[in-house]
Design a protein with these regions (language model features):
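Conserved aromatic
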Residues: 61, 158-161
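Short beta-strand-loop
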Residues: 37-73, 91-96, 113-120, 143-152
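VWA/integrin I-like adhesion module and closely mimicked acidic/polar interface patches used
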Residues: 17, 73-87, 91, 108-159, ...
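Sec/Tat-exported extracytoplasmic proteins
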Residues: 4-10, 22-33, 50-53, 71, ...
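A general structural motif
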Residues: 41, 99-101, 130
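Von Willebrand factor
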Residues: 1-58, 85-86, 103-107, 137-141
């Protein structure tokens, strides 16, 4: 599950970086050059958020054109409800089959100003699997809140601004 920050604080470079990153990882040919492509069996969910969860889109590993079009056609606006988006991701993964490795990747600047960490923590305690919640930062990232989320789920925070390829490789390598 990708939780994509489409809030107003991502306007400009942050959103451009996020958009480029998603186009890269969802493009089979480009991603396969770095051995990061999704397999045909992979299930991909993209949750977009700003002031609240805006959209939830689903695709299989090789059928990502519609996801890319939806992301490309989006405009950042609103505040930052990352906790709500991650909770939505946990709900989706908690209902999903045990046949898959489950991961949440938040792609954000980390300026969370809607919702509470305690809501996320309470939800996390109720999920049946230990699901890592990684963050890849963009724009003028605020990493403190993201580090707390990573600590909760035994994950990490990566800098998407300086070395996106390494961030993707590490996240994919942990799974």
């Amino acid at each position: 599950v990708f939780c994509l920050d489409f809030s107003g604080s991502m306007s400009g470079d942050g959103f451009d970086e996020l958009d480029d990153a998603m186009n890269y990882i969802l493009d089979y040919d480009r991603a396969s050059k770095d051995k990061l492509q999704f397999s045909a069996k992979d299930k991909i969910t993209v949750i977009t958020f700003g002031s609240h969860v805006y959209n939830t889109w689903h695709a299989s590993g090789h059928d990502t054109d519609e996801l890319r079009k939806n992301i490309d056609g989006s405009v950042p606006t609103g505040t930052t409800a990352l906790y709500d988006a991650v909770i939505k991701g946990l709900d989706i993964l908690n209902k999903d089959s045990d046949d898959y490795t489950k991961t949440i990747i938040a792609m954000t600047d980390g300026n969370i100003n809607v919702g509470t960490f305690s809501d996320l923590k309470n939800k996390y305690k109720k999920v049946k699997d230990e699901i890592p919640i990684y963050s890849i930062t963009f724009g003028s990232a605020e990493e403190e809140q993201l580090e707390v989320i990573a600590d909760l789920s035994n994950a990490r925070v990566f800098d998407g601004k300086t070395d996106l390829l390494t961030a993707f490789k590490k996240v994919r390598g942990y799974n």
